[in-house]
Amino acid sequence: MRKIVIVSAVWCHACLTMRKRNKALKDKYPDWQWVDLDLDLDDELVEPLKVGKLIPVYIIYENDLEVKRIAGEMSQDALESELLHV
């Protein structure tokens, strides 16, 4: 099963921009497990992920193994392509 962990923050402009794109992809791929984490509010869950300073971060898991990370703002098409090609 594919799981996408999205780490973002309410103060992050790029994260706010990506929120609508995330929603569209969540609707398109409902069989994927989507997990939204806030960099500040969920720090105990985010810290072990070592996401760095560039957010949003998308961590893609396949069968509970991390297979890819992508970070930053991008078009919906680019994000979808990145999420599909792991």
What are these regions (language model features)?
Residues 14, 56, 62:
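Conserved coupling/switch loop of ABC ATPases
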Residues 1-28:
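Local sequence-structure signature of Cys/Sec-based thiol-disulfide redox active-site neighborhoods
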Residues 49-59:
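Structural micro-motif
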Residues 59-86:
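Non-catalytic, surface beta->alpha helical segment in thiol-disulfide oxidoreductase systems
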Residues 7, 30-44:
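Thiol-based oxidoreductase modules, predominantly thioredoxin-like and allied folds used
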